[in-house]
């Protein structure tokens, strides 16, 4: 297996397992065997915690760059969330990566503009946000899809449409989250690219992947907060052999 960002991944794996991956790999290359180094060939024992690695992006410093994910490396760092269970570890990681968890106000809203292949998965996500008290807005295709599947949604004109449009809604201060998985591209004039850039400029969290959207919404719906999650002493994570 080849990991493109192994220079980032391996240190995290070593930290949370207590296994010095690089040292062992070098010694194996020099002819030693794992059994001679005190390690077996089976699975490493389960730890009493879960570790989640979350990428960090600096799109506000990268002018004109589309925030939609692709094969290119766009993250500028990563944070590690460690907790006794997956949910708390994910919450730690997302907060450490800069995601905000807001309580919806009377007029708080979310914007949806997603590609056709993602629309079925966003029905449940949109329902959860609606039940939390958010008002939902969507561009024409996304709005029609959500309403068709019994999720109340209001249509908003795209960036190239007449005012009032999605730009006015973004600038209203009422938008807590933008969910945009629509077409990515290098053309900065595309509506989808301009929307994501505008969200970044206004410091509005812009979610561009279904799995991230699911993770964020599940954290929003939980009763947990950072005050409820215990700290993990990272010095105790190492298991000497």
State where each predicted segment sits.
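ATP-dependent carboxylate activation and anion-phosphoryl transfer catalytic cores
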Residues: 4-105
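Peripheral docking tails and interdomain loops at the edges
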Residues: 157-241
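A general structural motif
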Residues: 86-92, 114-118, 136-138, 157-167
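Short connector loops at secondary-structure junctions
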Residues: 141-159
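Glycine-rich phosphate/diphosphate-binding loops that line cofactor/substrate pockets in enzymes
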Residues: 96-110, 129-131, 169-175
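Short internal beta-strands
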Residues: 111, 129, 133-146
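General beta-strand structural signal in soluble alpha/beta enzymes
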Residues: 81-82, 112, 136-140, 155-156, ...
């Amino acid at each position: 297996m080849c990991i493109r960002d192994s220079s980032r991944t391996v240190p995290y794996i070593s930290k949370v397992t207590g296994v010095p991956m690089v040292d062992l790999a070098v010694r194996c290359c020099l002819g030693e065997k794992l059994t001679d180094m005190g390690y077996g060939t089976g699975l490493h024992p389960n730890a009493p915690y879960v570790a989640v690695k979350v990428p960090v992006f600096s799109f506000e410093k990268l002018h004109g760059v589309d925030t939609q994910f692709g094969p290119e490396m766009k993250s500028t760092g990563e944070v590690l969330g460690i907790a006794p269970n997956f949910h708390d570890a994910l919450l730690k990681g997302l907060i450490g990566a800069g995601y905000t968890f807001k309580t919806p106000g009377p007029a708080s809203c979310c914007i949806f503009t997603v590609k056709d292949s993602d629309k079925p998965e966003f029905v449940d996500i949109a329902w959860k946000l609606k039940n939390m008290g958010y008002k939902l807005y969507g561009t024409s295709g996304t709005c029609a899809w959500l309403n068709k599947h019994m999720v109340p949604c209001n249509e908003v004109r795209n960036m190239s449409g007449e005012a009032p449009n999605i730009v006015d809604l973004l600038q209203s201060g009422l938008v807590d989250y933008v969910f945009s998985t629509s077409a990515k591209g290098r053309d900065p004039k595309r509506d989808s690219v301009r929307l994501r850039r505008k969200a970044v400029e206004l410091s509005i969290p812009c979610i561009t992947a279904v799995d991230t959207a699911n993770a964020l919404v599940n954290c929003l719906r939980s009763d947990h907060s950072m005050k409820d999650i215990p700290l993990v002493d990272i010095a105790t994570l190492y298991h000497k052999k």
